[in-house]
Structures are given as structure tokens and as C-alpha cells.
């Protein structure tokens, strides 16, 4: 394809992975990183690919969705996974790393690549083009650049994420839950309802108020939007606030009794197949341990709940990707701009790296005049892509960042008894489907990371 040149803005997990993949594809890369001249409040190290909040890339077990993503990225020659394997520290089946060695190794490999030039500068405006640029500036994108991205996104740029817990459908006690949309609107099975009597509601509110909360980072001022307050903050405003807010029972009579409960927790279908449900309005800063305990102990129908995702609220600059980005992760309004990483609405180190890999691959295809070939839907990479395009979610879904979870995958066919069997089936199907996608254009054999 000749010596094309692209710009990658941001040297985190997504930007580093993308820069490596592009360079391995024969493209000259200018990687623009604001450190060490300027840092976000969360960063300490001078190097690229700094792990901020944890040194863990989570489970390396390929029968978990994130472990399957690890496996796929290794097969694709991921720099991030190669560096993680080389700097691994003991952590059971989790892939945990020595942060400083990991960052130093990624930095060294990128600086040592003949087609990569690292420029240390803070970018304040989006490049005008016509050259291709990948924006991978992360959840703490600087104010000036964020304002430019917001203008591009037409208001579809969010500055905090408000994530409610998601529960596996088959762990909900259906002898307690009932299907009903408020006032009978919509298709009834889009929502499940968990009814409370007054005593159960009072006990639940008390548990929320007493529950242990996550302390905010120094760079996260606890300023909340009124439309997405943490449930415990609403509970602090008055004993009945939740019963008139996200837990209001109006229009949700129990069809088995014909009576209206004192309060309800509504569960909204999270995926098309109905394998997971979101606890509506339950964004929270309770610790994950407390979320599990309180929701299982105090919410009728969730005693045996298995959580696909737990709730959180934190500073996180992210685009409403399904509406702002095309399927190849380029901006619909300015196609020379591509986006990757947490700014697109993926959550987690590995997911960010995977998104960077996908964007780089799309850019290589654009430069070569080829159509972008998305990853197969049943792979972990494909599941993330389905999230970014909105394909994994039902109509009207409130787009929020997510980790890779099996709820994003297309439903399995056939019978699979038990959770372990379903995970095995997902993994085996993904392995078969990823193989022909790894190198469809016969240009990624050189994509393997250097030792």
C-alpha cells in the first residue's frame, strides 16, 4: 500500500495497540501523547500504556468473556497482550502485571519500531485532515479537546457514566418476578418487576444508607446529574424518594394478584435474546461487595442473582458510539477521524486495547481501498463491535460503557445445561469463527508482537 502515514492521538492501551498494529501493517505512525509535559490527574508514569486503577487485566480463563478476548488478541499478535504476558505477576487465573515494567516494555517496543514516531504534545483540536487520525484519548480527555469532540458529536458526548448492575436472566427467581411494562405499554417481556411490600422496602432503604461506598478519586468530584443520581444519594434525600422515583409502582400492578406493590425494582432487557436484565435506575457507588450482598439479601427475587456487571458512577468521557460512529469506527460527520478505546464506550483495559486493534484494522482497510470486514459476531471482538454499533442492544437502549460480557454475544443454538456448558459453547463457537477472520486479506501474518 506504500508508505501511508496516520496520526494516533493518545498513548494509552487503545492508542498503543493501534499504533503497533498500524506500523506492523506497513504504515508510518505519529503517536501523539501529552505526557510527560502534561498529565491527567490520574497518571503518574511517564511511559505509554499506563495502567491507572488496577494492575489486573482480569481473568485469563478463556471460558470467561474477557479471557476469550485475551485469547483472540494473542492470536492477532496484540502488543498489549504480549507485553502483559512478559510482565505477568502471580494472581491466580487473573492476568496481572508489573505496571512499571509493562509500561516500559510497551514504550520501548513502540519507540523502537522503525515506522513509529512518538511526539510529546497535548492536542487541543481535532486534526482537519485529509490524513487519517485515530483519537484514543481515554476517559479523562482534556477539556479543550473534549469540547471539540463534543461539537463533532452534536451533543452526544457524555462526561460521566452511570452504570447500573446487570443480572443474568436465568438467576432471577421467576416465581417472584412478573413481566409487565408500565401501564401495559410495549411488549410485556421487555421488563420484569420485583415487588416489595412496605416492610421490605424500608429494610432495603436502610441497607442502602448503611452500605459501604466507593471513595471518589481525587480527580472525580462527586457532582451528579439529577437525572442519574446514585440510588443511595436518592435514599439520603428521604425515606420515600425511591418509591416515587426509580422504584415507583404506578402502572405496574402484579397480574397474579391484581394489586399494586408498595414499590418495585424494574429490570429492563439488556440484550435482544433476553439473557440479561439491567436494574433500571440503580446506578450506584456502593462497593461491589455491598452491591452483591444488598441486592441478594434485600431485593425479592434476587437471592440467587448472578451479576453480569455491577454498578458504578465515575468521570468518563465517552461518545454515543452507535449514533456518532460508522461501523468502521470512523466519525459519520468527519470520516477521516477514527475513535477507539474508552472514549467510544468500552470499559476496561483489554476492551480498550481490542477497540484500538479494531480501529487500526479498519484504517488499514481504508488505506488499502478495501471494505472494512467486522469481526464475526460470535467472537469476543465481534461482541464488542456489536456493542459499539448498537447491534447487541434493543431499540431505545440507553448507551453506556460496558466490559465484554456474554450478554453481548448472539444467543447460542441448541441446548446447553448449566452456566459452565454455555460458557464452553460460547468459547468453542468463537474459536471457530475467529480463525478465518484473522487474516482475510493475507496481510496480518506480520502482526505478531516482537519478543
From Swiss-Prot:
A single GO molecular function term of this UniProt record: tRNA (uracil(54)-C5)-methyltransferase activity, 5,10-methylenetetrahydrofolate-dependent
EC number(s) given by UniProt: 2.1.1.74
Family matches, as SUPFAM superfamilies: FAD/NAD(P)-binding domain (SSF51905)
Record keywords, A-Z: Cytoplasm, FAD, Flavoprotein, Methyltransferase, NAD, NADP, Transferase, tRNA processing
Record's catalysed reaction(s): uridine(54) in tRNA + (6R)-5,10-methylene-5,6,7,8-tetrahydrofolate + NADH + H(+) = 5-methyluridine(54) in tRNA + (6S)-5,6,7,8-tetrahydrofolate + NAD(+); uridine(54) in tRNA + (6R)-5,10-methylene-5,6,7,8-tetrahydrofolate + NADPH + H(+) = 5-methyluridine(54) in tRNA + (6S)-5,6,7,8-tetrahydrofolate + NADP(+)
Cofactor(s) this protein cannot do without: FAD
Role according to the record: Catalyzes the folate-dependent formation of 5-methyl-uridine at position 54 (M-5-U54) in all tRNAs.
Protein name from the UniProt record: Methylenetetrahydrofolate--tRNA-(uracil-5-)-methyltransferase TrmFO
Organism, as annotated: Anaeromyxobacter sp. (strain Fw109-5)
The organism's taxonomic lineage, starting at the top: Bacteria, Pseudomonadati, Myxococcota, Myxococcia, Myxococcales
Amino acid at each position: 500500500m506504500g508508505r501511508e502515514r496516520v496520526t494516533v492521538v493518545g498513548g494509552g492501551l487503545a492508542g498503543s495497540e493501534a499504533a503497533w498494529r498500524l506500523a506492523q501493517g506497513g504504515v508510518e505512525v505519529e503517536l501523539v501523547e501529552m505526557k510527560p509535559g502534561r498529565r491527567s490527574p490520574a497518571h503518574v508514569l511517564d511511559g505509554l500504556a499506563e495502567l491507572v486503577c488496577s494492575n489486573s487485566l482480569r481473568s485469563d480463563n478463556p471460558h470467561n468473556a474477557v479471557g476469550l478476548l485475551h485469547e483472540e488478541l494473542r492470536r492477532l499478535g496484540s502488543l498489549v497482550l504480549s507485553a502483559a504476558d512478559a510482565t505477568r505477576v502471580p494472581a491466580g487465573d487473573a492476568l496481572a502485571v508489573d505496571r512499571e515494567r509493562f509500561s516500559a516494555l510497551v514504550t520501548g517496543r513502540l519507540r523502537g519500531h522503525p515506522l513509529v514516531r512518538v511526539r510529546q504534545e497535548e492536542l487541543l483540536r481535532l486534526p482537519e485532515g485529509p490524513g487519517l487520525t485515530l483519537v484514543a484519548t481515554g476517559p479523562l480527555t482534556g477539556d479543550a479537546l473534549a469540547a471539540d469532540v463534543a461539537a463533532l458529536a452534536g451533543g452526544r458526548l457524555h462526561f460521566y457514566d452511570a452504570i447500573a448492575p446487570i443480572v443474568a436472566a436465568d438467576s432471577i427467581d421467576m416465581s417472584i418476578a412478573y413481566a409487565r411494562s408500565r401501564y401495559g405499554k410495549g411488549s410485556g417481556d421487555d421488563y420484569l418487576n420485583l415487588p416489595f411490600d412496605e416492610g421490605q422496602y424500608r429494610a432495603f432503604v436502610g441497607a442502602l444508607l448503611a452500605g459501604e461506598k466507593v471513595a471518589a478519586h481525587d480527580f472525580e468530584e462527586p457532582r451528579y446529574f439529577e437525572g442519574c443520581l446514585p440510588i443511595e444519594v436518592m435514599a439520603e434525600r428521604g425515606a420515600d424518594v425511591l418509591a416515587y422515583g426509580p422504584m415507583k409502582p404506578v402502572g405496574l400492578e402484579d397480574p397474579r394478584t391484581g394489586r399494586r406493590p408498595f414499590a418495585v425494582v424494574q429490570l429492563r432487557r439488556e440484550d435482544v435474546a433476553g439473557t440479561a436484565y439491567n436494574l433500571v435506575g440503580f446506578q450506584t457507588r456502593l462497593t461491589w461487595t455491598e452491591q452483591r450482598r444488598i441486592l441478594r439479601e434485600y431485593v425479592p427475587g434476587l437471592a440467587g442473582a448472578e451479576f453480569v456487571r455491577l454498578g458504578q458512577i465515575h468521570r468518563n468521557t465517552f461518545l454515543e458510539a452507535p449514533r456518532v460512529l460508522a461501523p468502521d469506527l470512523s466519525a459519520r460527520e468527519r470520516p477521516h477521524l477514527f475513535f477507539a478505546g474508552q472514549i467510544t464506550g468500552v470499559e476496561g483495559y483489554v476492551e480498550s486495547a481490542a477497540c484500538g486493534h479494531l480501529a487500526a484494522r479498519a484504517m488499514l482497510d481504508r488505506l488499502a481501498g478495501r471494505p472494512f470486514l467486522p469481526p464475526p459476531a460470535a467472537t469476543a471482538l465481534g461482541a464488542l463491535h456489536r456493542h459499539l454499533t448498537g447491534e447487541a442492544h434493543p431499540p431505545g437502549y440507553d448507551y453506556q460503557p460496558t466490559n465484554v460480557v456474554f450478554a453481548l454475544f448472539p444467543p447460542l443454538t441448541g441446548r446447553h445445561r448449566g452456566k459452565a456448558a454455555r460458557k464452553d459453547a460460547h468459547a468453542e463457537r468463537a474459536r471457530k469463527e475467529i480463525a478465518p477472520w484473522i487474516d482475510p486479506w493475507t496481510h496480518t501474518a506480520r502482526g505478531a508482537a516482537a519478543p
